[in-house]
Amino acid sequence: MKKIVLPFLVIVFALVAFTNVDNCSLSYKGIYAFKLDNEHSAILRFYEDGTVLASTSVNDYLDVFTWFHKENKDMVLTGKYKIKKCSIKFEVTGATGTQKYEGTIRGETLEVKLTDEATKKTATRAYTYFPLGL
């Protein structure tokens, strides 16, 4: 019986470990959005080189893709992100100030605590992924 249980446990553990790794990956071909109200969303975009962009926008996400990119730095907050296991941390800066984010990647959702550096106000948000070309 012990000979059967041990290999079974090893297989189950390996499957759980690999599933969690996949669940902790960012998606780079779209945006993460948090609906602020009926008309506006807070948006994030990540790049494989470690760059992150943050802004607010109307809820028409197809329109967002026309201007929300690295080459348009004047209209967005920019920074670098770091991932450790399922945790993510980044700081973005722009004309409107600096914001710090710290949270967890859960599949296509980012659960983060946001801190505005000027006011020290915090907010907890769950951003949802929307692929490019919805």
Kindly label every feature range from the protein language model.
Residues 18-134:
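Lipid interaction determinants
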